[in-house]
Amino acid sequence: MSEWPTSIQITEVGPRDGLQNQSKPISTEAKISLINALSKTGLTCIETSAFVHPTWVPQLSDADEVFAGINRNSNVLYTALVPNERGWNRALAAGADEIAVLSAASETFCQRNTNTSIDGAIERIRPIVEHAVTCEVGVRGYISCVIACPYEGDTNLQTVRYITQQMLDMGITDI
C-alpha cells in the first residue's frame, strides 16, 4: 500500500463556482466580505472569481473590483478562472496568485460551456498556460464531466486521459 500524503490543499471555489449561477445579483461588497471571512478560516487557496465575459456570467462581471477590494492574507493564494487570453490579461493585472483553465471530457458540454470543441478548448488554453509559466504563475487545470455528462451520459475514460495528458504536456501539474 502506498504512503498517504502528509498534507493536502483544499481550494475553496465558493466565491466563483458557488456564486456564478445565483439568480439574484450579489453585491461586490458582499463577495469581498465573503472572501475576507474565508481568508480568516485557515484556508490556503480561494478561487476568488473568474475573468469571463459579463454577458455569459453576469454574477462575475465585477471580478476586477473584487480582487481590488479584498484584504489579502499572506497565507492564502487568491486564484481566478480564466477561459481565454483576455481573461488571463485581466487576472494578471488584478494580481491573481494562480489561475485555473478548463476543458470538458464531453463535446456537448464543452460546446455549451465554452462554445468550442474539446480540441478547441485545449488550443485556447495553451497560450494562457505558456504565459503563466513564463510569468511563474501557477496553473490549475479543470476537466468537467470526468465521470458523466448531463447531456451525453457516461464519459469515455480515454477522453479524460487525452485531456489530462494534453494539460500535463503544457506544464499544468495540478489537475
Protein language model features and the residues they cover:
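Conserved N-terminal beta1-alpha1 strand-loop-helix module at the mouth
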Residues: W4-F51, Q59-A63, G69-N75
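Short, well-ordered coil/turn segments that N-cap beta-strands
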Residues: P5-I8, G42-T44, R72-Y78, A96-D97, ...
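Active-site mouth loops of central-metabolism enzymes
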Residues: T11-I32, V76-E85, R112-S117, C145-Q158
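Non-cysteine beta-strand/loop elements that form the S-adenosyl-L-methionine
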Residues: T11-V13, D97-S106, R140-S144
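Conserved, mostly hydrophobic/aromatic
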Residues: G18, L38, A91, I99, ...
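Glycine-rich, proline-tolerant flexible connector loops at the mouths of alpha/beta enzymes
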Residues: T44-G69, L102-S117, I147-E152
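Alpha-helix-loop-beta-strand connector modules within alpha/beta enzyme cores
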Residues: W56-A80, D119-S144, Y162-Q166
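Catalytic cores of alpha/beta
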Residues: E85-G95
